[in-house]
Amino acid sequence: MAKHSQHSSPPRKLFDTLNDLWQRAKSEAGLSAEGPEGTRRRNNLILYLLLVLSTLYLLNGYQTLRNEEIPYSEFLKAVAEGRVEQAVVTEQTISGTLKPEAEGESTRPFITVPLWNHELAAELEKKGVKYTVRYGSNWFSSLIFNWIVPIVLLTLFWTWMARRMTGGRGFLSIGKKTRIQADTAAKVTFGDVAGADEAKQELRETIEFLQNPTRIQSLGGRMPKGVLLVGPPGTGKTLLARAVAGEAGVPFFNISGSEFIELFVGVGAARVRDLFEQARQNAPCIIFIDELDAIGRSRGGPVVMGGHDEREQTLNQLLTEMDGFDPSVGVAVMAATNRPEILDKALLRSGRFDRQIVVDKPGLEDRVSILKLHTRKMKLAADVDLRVVAQRTPGFVGADLANAANEAAIIAVRANKAAIGMADFEAAIDRILAGPEKKSRLLNDAEKHRVAVHESGHALVAEIVPTGQPVHKVSIIPRGAAALGFTLQLPVEEKFLSTEQELKDQIAILLGGRTAEELVFGESSSGAQNDLEKASEIARTMVCSLGMSKVLGPLTYGRRQQLAYLSVEGAEERNFSEETARLIDNEVRKLIEEGLQRVREILTHHRVTLDRLAALLREKEVVSGEDVKAVIREAAS
């Protein structure tokens, strides 16, 4: 009876040895490490292998391309003429180098396909050619460089791309990219969200449904399937969603709408299915989709890529999942967008996103609360009044206020102050509104005088017209990309409507700078370009959208697609005739000309005040609103 060997076969031993060496190399290089560091190292290794193999492949191809292919007859002629320096003869090819044809030239590498010739060796010896004969073919190197190396390169490149797209978790996990917020992460609660009291009140009901879903079921109702947060950028929509999860104490699945769309077809739908499957397994929980418009755009647009639209497939899967899951399991779907106008109607119907909560720009009291929240860890000087700061930042959202507080801290540090003062907040607000000061942009005396007259015209008209907002500051220090000066007005109170008189006063204030230049210098300059654009826009809105034209009457003309929360206007649909267009142009021109005539009368009547204000502005470069009022009172007395 034959005995079986206790030793493994040589191939098996070789495999085990190579495997041990590979595992040891992985351990020493840190490739087995878990987490982002291990992923980064493995991705780098794949990238290095790609570079090395690509270099070898290119070098082999370069070596092949260097050899000039010549006919066999030309090779025989070169041998006969003694122009062959050396040769390598195989069964398939003859390669080598030809001697330089002239002094100073280099040798020429060549390759040719031979015919069977017994006299070739004798001829080479006769001419003194160094030659080598190699039996067998180079099939192995051809196999390596023509097949194996390209396949390995493509495989490594595909693997590297897949790992980058899936966060380093491998190709098979490409449809699973949902991130769940770790329980150890710092919890965000409503105490960390200032303002937005109405939104927080509605979201508290969502928290109650998550914590006690049977309460509404006992009355025969059901908890809302979806909550959509809409509002301008920076108002805290994502922060509110995190606060809901923190208050409810449930897992929080957070994914951006853009993460559903990848290079591969079907990935978006797979990620939607995986997202809802994870949510069911971790119920009660919250699914939060940020920037929903990335996948929720209305269907029916132009067909792309041969009739298949990955975004529409992802949206269809999302609609199916929101219809299919049971609301009694305690899964709340929340989403945020600042473009609700472009969302698909099927996504917004009842039974999917039942509630739409507007997170709008904060009012005065909310801005005070937000400033207190963002400055609670800052060292503030005694002269800082956050209510005054809030009054001077109308239209600022939470992100803008946080940026203003941080800019004030940076300015205070730059000045080596022990605490942040009111002047630092003023400088920070000016920087955000008008851009940083350009002290290197020096104006000559003539330009400085013209800018001072221009800004004085704005400020003077703003203080004289009946509904003008008070002037807070006038400056002729260049700021931002192109502004050579600015006049800052701040409202006394929050306003949500504008009357016809207020709009006409705004046009007059905008035309004040150009008219002041014409009055003092006899001509205007290019500095009034932006003023004219804004004045023309207000006048056209009055005529076409607000019905403030007696000739055209209370009608609207033209339909323009608008993104309300982004202040972006699309193409205008013209729904009026050429004759009406001429009437619109005439009415707009009439409003502008009436404004110009009105401003000329104001500035002519207050010419002394204009000159004094311009002189003060040239001297100080920055004049406060109190100084402007003092000059007006002094000139009037």
Swiss-Prot record:
Active-site residues, as the UniProt record annotates them: 455
Subcellular location: Cell inner membrane
Assembly and interaction partners: Homohexamer.
Residues annotated to bind Zn(2+): 454, 458, 531
Function: Acts as a processive, ATP-dependent zinc metallopeptidase for both cytoplasmic and membrane proteins. Plays a role in the quality control of integral membrane proteins.
The keyword Protease belongs to this UniProt entry's keyword annotation: yes
Matches recorded under Gene3D superfamilies: 1.10.8.60, 3.30.720.210, P-loop containing nucleotide triphosphate hydrolases, Peptidase M41
Family annotation (CDD domains): RecA-like_FtsH (cd19501)
Enzyme class: hydrolase
Protein name: ATP-dependent zinc metalloprotease FtsH
Statement: the UniProt record of this protein carries the keyword Protease: yes
NCBIfam families: FtsH_fam
InterPro entries, A to Z: AAA+_ATPase, AAA_lid_3, ATPase_AAA_core, ATPase_AAA_CS, FtsH, P-loop_NTPase, Pept_M41_FtsH_extracell, Peptidase_M41
SUPFAM superfamilies reported in the protein's UniProt record: FtsH protease domain-like, P-loop containing nucleoside triphosphate hydrolases
Organism: Methylococcus capsulatus (strain ATCC 33009 / NCIMB 11132 / Bath)
Membrane topology: Multi-pass membrane protein
Keywords: ATP-binding, Cell inner membrane, Cell membrane, Hydrolase, Membrane, Metal-binding, Metalloprotease, Nucleotide-binding, Protease, Transmembrane, Transmembrane helix, Zinc
Pfam families: AAA, AAA_lid_3, FtsH_ext, Peptidase_M41
HAMAP family named in the record: FtsH
Listed GO MF terms: ATP binding; ATP hydrolysis activity; ATP-dependent peptidase activity; metalloendopeptidase activity; zinc ion binding
Gene Ontology BP term (one): protein catabolic process
PROSITE patterns per UniProt: AAA
TM ranges: 45-65, 142-162
Entry cofactors: Zn(2+)
GO-annotated cellular components: plasma membrane
